[in-house]
């Protein structure tokens, strides 16, 4: 595999695809409580995010230039690795179909309410197919190119909203139990779990020789920026429209920004948010389409994948229509099934893998010690 991706591009991609969930799904899910409970949930999410970051560092250092499938082969052998990859492939199909729906609903609920979902599906698939023909390197470079402008615009939105903040909306004591707070933290953890997916591209990273300090630095900065942006967006959203209203809106931050002006000069510029969410959705769909194709490649031992692009696009089109029919179906699928499934695929299985990794190291070191003892005898 050609080394075409840098660590910076990997982490930029994670932040870019996280923007839409930060603006839509997570504030709506955290709105069950209030700003105080949301802050506590963010802190609780670190209990999972910090170990996940350490896990990524361990795997990157222990298996340099290995992708996720090759790591599984090293730990379990080829047969078990193919079964696990098939499981990851099914999961990525469902996530991809859900992301296509979420992108569609974001546009329908904001500026194109009378447009049929099939139009959005086909439009996105054409764009993704074009991106795939340009190559995965181009997709990651595009994420690197658009992330900084997206973040600058979001911070301008947040600063512009400060004069309109209602403190009585956010100065509320937490009323949720610890188990409910953990449930809210689960939504944050499920979105942040995309960090684990960088292991999928371990064989494509250019600068693996610098992995130790470089990965740690990028991980700390990425997680910190993710959480800071999440806190700011959630607090601003709750302080403008209230947590009760946020819970009932699919795009709460977009609604909160309506009527906000910059220096009393620029007004009604919330439409730029639609472009930002579209770019984030586009990159997220590209990423999960790439992961799905890689899982097919590894599970079926296929070398060339271009002939599968159009059949796979048609498959995802119909899978999305079969899985969901309405916004209620999408929300039910995500909140009831997909969040828990994400936690299993991005946390439970990886942490099980790290246990197997260290147990194999322990067995190997024990055998080496026995060999040394016998040789001395």
Regions found by a protein language model. Give the residues of each.
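Membrane-interface "cap" regions at the ends of multi-pass membrane proteins
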Residues: 1-28, 34-36, 204-208, 359-377
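Membrane-interface interhelical connector segments
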Residues: 240-270
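Hydrophobic, membrane-embedded alpha-helices of multi-pass small-molecule transporters
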Residues: 5-26, 41, 45, 49, ...
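Extracellular loop-to-transmembrane helix junctions
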Residues: 29-57, 335-351, 361, 365-371
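Membrane-water interface regions at transmembrane-helix termini and the short interhelical loops
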Residues: 32, 108, 125-146, 204-208, ...
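Membrane helical hairpin/interfacial module
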Residues: 23-28, 32-117
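Selective recognition of specific alpha-helical transmembrane segments in multi-pass small-molecule
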Residues: 44-55, 89-99, 127-128, 148-162, ...
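Hydrophobic alpha-helical segments and their helix-loop junctions in multi-pass secondary transporters
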Residues: 93-96, 100, 132, 149-174, ...
């Amino acid at each position: 595999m050609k080394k075409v991706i840098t660590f910076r591009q990997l982490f930029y991609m994670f932040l870019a695809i996280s923007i839409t969930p930060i603006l839509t799904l997570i504030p709506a899910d955290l709105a069950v409580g209030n700003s105080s409970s949301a802050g506590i949930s963010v802190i609780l999410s670190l209990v999972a995010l910090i170990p996940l970051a350490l896990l990524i560092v361990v795997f990157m250092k222990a298996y340099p230039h290995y992708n996720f499938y090759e790591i599984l082969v090293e730990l379990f052998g080829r047969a078990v690795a193919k079964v696990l990859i098939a499981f990851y492939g099914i999961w990525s199909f469902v996530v991809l179909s859900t992301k296509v729906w979420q992108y569609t609903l974001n546009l329908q609920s904001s500026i194109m309410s009378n447009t049929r979902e099939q139009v959005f599906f086909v439009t996105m698939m054409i764009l993704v197919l074009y991106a795939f023909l340009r190559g995965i390197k181009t997709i990651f470079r595009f994420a690197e190119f658009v992330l900084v402008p997206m973040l600058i615009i979001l911070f301008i939105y947040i600063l512009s909203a400060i004069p309109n903040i209602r403190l009585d909306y956010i100065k509320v004591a937490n009323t949720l139990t610890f188990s409910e707070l953990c449930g809210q933290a689960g939504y944050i953890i499920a979105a942040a779990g995309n960090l684990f997916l960088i292991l999928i591209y371990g064989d494509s990273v250019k600068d693996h020789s610098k992995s130790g300090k470089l990965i740690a630095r990028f991980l700390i900065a990425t997680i910190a920026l993710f959480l800071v942006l999440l806190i700011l967006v959630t607090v601003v959203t709750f302080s403008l429209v209230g947590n009760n209203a946020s819970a009932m809106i699919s795009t709460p931050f977009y609604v909160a920004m309506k009527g906000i002006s910059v220096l009393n000069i620029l007004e009604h510029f919330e439409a730029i948010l639609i472009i930002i969410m579209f770019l984030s959705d586009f990159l997220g769909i590209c990423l999960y389409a790439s992961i799905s194709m890689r899982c097919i490649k590894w599970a079926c031992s296929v070398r060339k994948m271009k002939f599968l692009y159009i059949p796979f696009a048609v498959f995802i089109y119909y899978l999305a229509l079969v899985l969901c029919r309405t916004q209620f179906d999408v929300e039910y699928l995500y909140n009831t099934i997909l969040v828990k499934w994400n936690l299993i695929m991005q946390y439970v299985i990886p942490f099980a893998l790290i246990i197997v990794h260290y147990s194999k190291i322990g067995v190997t070191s024990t055998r080496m010690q026995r060999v040394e003892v016998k040789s001395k005898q």
